[in-house]
Amino acid sequence: MRSVYIGGGTPTALPLAMLDEVLAECHYDVDEFTVEAGRPDTITPSVLNLLKKHGVTRISVNPQTFNDKTLELIGRKHKSEQVVKAFKRAKKMFKVNMDLIAMLPEETLDDFKYSVDKAVELSPENITVHTLYLKRGSLLRNEGYRNTENTVAEQMVDYAYRKLTEAGYNPYYMYRQKYTSGNLENVGYAKAGEECIYNIDIMEEDTSI
């Protein structure tokens, strides 16, 4: 086993004592230990120090978007500036992945471009670009939102590819889900030599989950 990955969801939202117990059970001698810390309010000095204590090497700080209007619309309880502050705090201690989502409700191509540009400016080791995935039972789907505008979705994904590759990121893994915008893929980008071991092993089916 080369890597440990805890997430999705936000395991850093657990009470500190409980998170300590979980990490202690997963503290193996591996090349890479990733924990998802999607919500910026969970990325506190106490949590970061605990992750470090248990050998975590990589975390995910997931803005989804850097547009505050969209964050409010999709029910997020934070502002983009909180994500930036949490990222800068985490970056001092860990490698970082950031997730972005194309085709969030009411977002334009320019809105998405802004988020991509902001992520590149922050310069995490990894940036993963998702297209919005609507589960059949999701609130957005039940409220009638449909993510079927293929042209805009393709433009968003194309922009992300151009911007990220120009900035020195290379696409290194890809996967597809049902009900995504434009039936497009989710793509992981990494700086040279910073590819996520877990993602590679899972995509190549070289390891068990």
Predicted regions and their residues:
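Auxiliary Fe-S-binding modules of radical SAM enzymes
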Residues: 143-209
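Conserved non-cysteine loop/helix-boundary elements of the Radical SAM core domain that shape
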Residues: 1-160
